[in-house]
Curated annotation (Swiss-Prot):
Low complexity bias locations: 201-218
GO process terms (BP): proteolysis
Name of protein: Lipoprotein signal peptidase
Family: Belongs to the peptidase A8 family.
Disulfide bonds: none
Gene name as annotated: lspA
TM regions (residue ranges): 31-51, 84-104, 108-128, 156-176
Phenotype of the disrupted gene, per the record: No processing of prolipoprotein LppX and synthetic prolipoprotein constructs.
Domain of life: Bacteria
Role this protein plays: This protein specifically catalyzes the removal of signal peptides from prolipoproteins.
UniProt organism field: Mycolicibacterium smegmatis (strain ATCC 700084 / mc(2)155) (Mycobacterium smegmatis)
Family annotation (PANTHER family): LIPOPROTEIN SIGNAL PEPTIDASE
Length: 235
């Protein structure tokens, strides 16, 4: 006999969050590449203008002698560090760019996409100089043009890389992972260990051989009295 009150089965549909989750890495990758493209564009344009308008060794004052336009050719890393290792820095920067692009395909956090985009744009901007400026490929000198006080001369790419790295460190410290949208829950890492401890079987108590439960008969009582008597005898 069939139940006439039951209606037709409703089709099972995915939740809106499940339908959007596969598209999130693609959107984050687009955000990453957009930020990187903006940084790269600003870096390349400002370097071209600096080379055309500035003369090496002749700073142009912006705020006295504290902030100036100063054209410098840098063979080292950001802020004129590690000079003399140009080809090593070029290979390292190339590896960083490849790693960020590979990681960008799995990004879910928009903040991680922003930080990685800043690093990618800055690293790519300096790589353009490494490959296409004198004295040659892998050995090209980066164009720096902005000087602030005692700080080394830098360009747009340098603070972009440093700012992106600081952002990623802050996100990691505050519990924002690259593969999640929000913060990581504080007890999320402790749950597996707690579950494992609960499932550990308890060891049986070693109290000697088990005796059958039930009423004590005359023979058992006599045996117990003999045992007590032997224990009470002086040694």
């Amino acid at each position: 006999m069939t139940d006439e009150t039951s209606g037709p089965a409703e089709p099972v549909t995915d939740a809106p969050g499940d339908a959007e989750s596969p598209a999130q890495p693609k959107r984050r990758l687009r955000l990453l590449l957009t930020v990187a493209a903006v940084v790269l564009f600003l870096d390349v344009v400002t370097k071209v203008l600096a080379v055309r308008l500035l003369t090496p060794g002749q700073p142009v004052s912006i705020i006295g002698d504290t902030v100036t336009w100063t054209l410098v050719r840098n063979s080292g890393a950001a802020f004129s560090m590690a000079t003399g290792y140009t080809w090593v820095l070029t290979l390292v920067a190339t590896g960083v760019v490849i790693g960020i692009i590979w990681m960008g395909r799995r990004l879910v956090s928009p903040w991680w996409a922003l930080g990685l985009g800043l690093i990618l744009g800055g690293a790519t901007g300096n790589l353009v100089d490494r490959f296409f400026r004198s004295p040659g490929p892998l050995r090209g000198h980066v164009v720096d043009f902005f000087s602030v006080g005692w700080w080394p001369v830098f360009n747009v790419a340098d603070p972009s890389v440093v700012g992106g790295a600081i952002l990623l460190v802050a996100l990691s410290l505050f519990g924002f992972d690259f593969d999640t949208v929000g913060r990581r829950r504080p007890g999320e890492d402790a749950e597996p260990s707690a579950g494992a401890s609960d499932s550990t079987p308890e060891a049986p108590a070693a109290d000697g051989p088990d005796k059958p439960a039930g009423p004590v008969g005359p023979e058992d009582a006599a045996e117990e009295s003999k045992t007590v008597g032997h224990q009470a005898e002086p040694s």
